[in-house]
């Protein structure tokens, strides 16, 4: 785990609440607007930022994030420009961890060694690469860890106790528990099942466990945050951005403020989570 990531989780745990992890697609709807969104997230209460890298074949993404990726690609967003987003953000914010989330193909084409060097220079703290299983750790995970970049793995309801140790073997930063099988943006499952799943993962690792896929409202964040170390919100933010755009997909005056308002509400939800659990 990078020092910045470790410090952020420790600081938030000391406050007695879960971490709020916010995802958005880099370059959606354009570079400058997404930079403004990224800069607004911590001010609205985000603790960790997941910065999406657009890809033409995003197999794990639901319709909303697929459309966000298409908008970003249409606007000219690339992996290099996504690293530039991180670099520009990091010049003003030294404390908020950045996790790049995407697929292996753009990294492979960019060049693994070059990518990792540029990611370190840009201030990236972690990676989530959804199509690289543990059996392929030598491709990117191990080199990333050697550079000091966390490699965050996804666990799902179908990850059984035989598979889980392999998934966790080289995981660092935090574990991302996908609270349902399927694609992003699905409905939220039974909270009691999530609490049991978090406890099961924690019996195998000392890493924080963050829960995502399906978290859309402050109430969702409050319920999930009662048992998880962190709450991940993505589709709701992407939908908020999309709803603010013109029919042509261009930014409006409501785009950034709309995201800020949503994240402030989600932040209030995670801050109420442990209070609700204690009642």
From Swiss-Prot:
Xref: CDD domains: Tryptophan_synthase_alpha
Keyword annotations for this protein, in alphabetical order, are: Amino-acid biosynthesis, Aromatic amino acid biosynthesis, Lyase, Tryptophan biosynthesis
Role description:
The alpha subunit is responsible for the aldol cleavage of indoleglycerol phosphate to indole and glyceraldehyde 3-phosphate.
Question: What's the gene?
Answer: trpA
* Residues of the active site: 50, 61
Listed pathway(s): Amino-acid biosynthesis; L-tryptophan biosynthesis; L-tryptophan from chorismate: step 5/5
Q: What is this protein called?
A: Tryptophan synthase alpha chain
Q: Which GO terms describe its molecular function?
A: tryptophan synthase activity
Which chemical reaction does it catalyze? (1S,2R)-1-C-(indol-3-yl)glycerol 3-phosphate + L-serine = D-glyceraldehyde 3-phosphate + L-tryptophan + H2O
Record's subunit section: Tetramer of two alpha and two beta chains.
Domain of life, per lineage: Bacteria
């Amino acid at each position: 785990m990078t020092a910045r990531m470790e410090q952020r989780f420790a600081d938030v745990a000391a406050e007695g609440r879960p971490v709020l992890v916010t995802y958005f697609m880099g370059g959606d709807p354009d570079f400058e607007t997404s930079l403004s969104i990224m800069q607004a997230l911590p001010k609205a209460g985000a603790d960790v930022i997941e910065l999406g890298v657009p890809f033409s074949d995003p197999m794990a993404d639901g319709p909303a994030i697929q459309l966000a990726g298409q908008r970003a690609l249409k606007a000219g967003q690339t992996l290099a420009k996504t690293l530039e987003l991180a670099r520009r953000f990091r010049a003003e914010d030294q404390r908020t961890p950045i996790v790049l989330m995407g697929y292996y193909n753009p990294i492979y084409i960019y060049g693994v060694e070059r990518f990792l060097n540029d990611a370190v220079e840009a201030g990236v703290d972690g990676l989530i690469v959804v199509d690289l299983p543990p059996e392929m750790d030598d491709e990117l995970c191990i080199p990333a860890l050697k550079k000091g970049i966390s490699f965050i793995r996804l666990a799902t309801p179908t990850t059984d106790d035989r598979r889980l140790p392999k998934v966790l073997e080289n995981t660092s930063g935090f574990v991302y528990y996908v609270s349902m099988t399927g694609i992003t943006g699905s409905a939220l499952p039974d909270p009691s099942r999530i609490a049991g799943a978090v406890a099961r993962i924690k019996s195998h690792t000392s890493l924080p466990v963050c829960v995502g896929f399906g978290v859309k409202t402050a109430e969702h964040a409050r319920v999930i945050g009662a048992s998880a170390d962190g709450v991940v919100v993505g589709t709701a933010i992407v939908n908020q951005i999309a709803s603010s755009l013109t029919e042509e997909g261009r930014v409006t005056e409501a785009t950034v403020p709309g995201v800020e308002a949503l994240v402030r509400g989600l932040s209030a939800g995670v801050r109420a989570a442990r209070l609700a659990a204690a009642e």
